[in-house]
């Protein structure tokens, strides 16, 4: 049955939504209203069944291809589809000898048959209380009570998070005080961020100024040292060029004399 559920188009679900009351009828009730002159439902294929039970307005959709079925499924009779459903149920491990009575083909509704066959992927919610059924060119009104369906609505995780952030799952609007407080928090956050950015820029500017002053001071010292080095080099060259003069004689000289007689 996995292949039967594969290639079903959305127009089928939309059509069943419009004619949901009709699909709530049991198959033996549909056969009764169709009359004895009609073809038995068990020998009809699904394509014939849909064309038979649908009103003329919906038959136009069938002819136009809006209500298309997979070819392998549309050619199967109702009995064959029901047999496949029972085999699939037994193959999945469902016991046939249970305390609950298993429904027969005539006891299930047309909607249940299409659901189990995989034609419809979601349950159709009844919208009307009166159904007009085409039978040998005549319309028979069938009244039934709407079936109330209860269940939990599922939400994606991202939508749940968005709804929680917006203040809950209810549609009640937030109080003006909450909006004002939230706006003030946002404004304070933006103001703090701007002040932090200004401080960072000022600190970076002061750091660049200190680096530039230190570099300028080093450049001045280097230039002074280079000038002194150049002066010393020139003085040394001048000393090499000038001739060397002998040292001057002393003013008083020592002389050797004889003071004793021999």
Swiss-Prot record:
The keyword Phosphoprotein applies. Transmembrane segments: none annotated. Residues 239-262 are annotated as: Disordered. Its main location: nucleus. It comes from the Eukaryota. Predominantly expressed in seeds. GO terms for biological process: abscisic acid-activated signaling pathway; regulation of abscisic acid biosynthetic process; response to water deprivation; stomatal closure. Residues 218-232 are annotated as: Leucine-zipper. Pfam families: bZIP_1. It is found in: Nucleus. Disruption phenotype: No visible changes in phenotype. The modification Phosphoserine is found at residues 21, 43, 66. Residues 190-253 form the bZIP domain. Residues 192-211 are annotated as: Basic motif. Keywords: Abscisic acid signaling pathway, Activator, DNA-binding, Nucleus, Phosphoprotein, Transcription, Transcription regulation. One of its GO terms (molecular function) is transcription cis-regulatory region binding. The modification Phosphothreonine is found at residue 104. GO terms for cellular component: nucleus. InterPro entries: bZIP, BZIP46-like, bZIP_sf. Residues 239-252 have a biased composition (Basic and acidic residues). Binds to the embryo specification element and the ABA-responsive element (ABRE) of the Dc3 gene promoter and to the ABRE of the Em1 gene promoter. Could participate in abscisic acid-regulated gene expression during seed development. DNA-binding heterodimer with ABI5/DPBF1, DPBF2 or AREB3/DPBF3. Interacts with the AFP proteins AFP2, AFP3 and AFP4. Belongs to the bZIP family. ABI5 subfamily. This is ABSCISIC ACID-INSENSITIVE 5-like protein 3. The lineage of its organism: Eukaryota, Viridiplantae, Streptophyta, Embryophyta, Tracheophyta. The gene is DPBF4.
């Amino acid at each position: 049955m996995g292949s039967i559920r594969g290639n079903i188009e959305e127009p089928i679900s939309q059509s069943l939504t419009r004619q949901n009351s009709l699909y709530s009828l049991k198959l033996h009730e549909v056969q009764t209203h169709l009359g004895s002159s009609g073809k038995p439902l068990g020998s009809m294929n699904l394509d014939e069944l849909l064309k038979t039970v649908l009103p003329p307005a919906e038959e136009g959709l069938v002819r136009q291809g809006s209500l298309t079925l997979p070819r392998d499924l549309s050619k199967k009779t109702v009995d064959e589809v029901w047999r496949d459903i029972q085999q699939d149920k037994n193959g999945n491990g469902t016991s046939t000898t249970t305390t609950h009575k298993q429904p027969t083909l005539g006891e299930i509704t047309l909607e249940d048959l299409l659901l189990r066959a995989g034609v419809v992927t979601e349950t159709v919610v009844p919208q009307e209380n009166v159904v007009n059924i085409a039978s040998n060119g005549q319309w028979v009104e069938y009244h039934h009570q709407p079936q109330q369906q209860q269940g939990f609505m599922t939400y994606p995780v991202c939508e749940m998070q968005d709804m929680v952030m917006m203040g809950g799952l209810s549609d009640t609007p937030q109080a003006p005080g909450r909006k004002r407080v939230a706006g003030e928090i946002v404004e304070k956050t933006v103001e703090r961020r701007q002040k932090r950015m200004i401080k960072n820029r000022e600190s970076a500017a002061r750091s660049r100024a200190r680096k530039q002053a230190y570099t300028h001071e080093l450049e001045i010292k280097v230039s002074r040292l280079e000038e002194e080095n150049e002066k010393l080099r020139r003085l040394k060259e001048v000393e090499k060029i000038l001739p060397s003069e002998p040292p001057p004689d002393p003013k008083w000289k020592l002389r050797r004399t004889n003071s004793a007689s021999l």
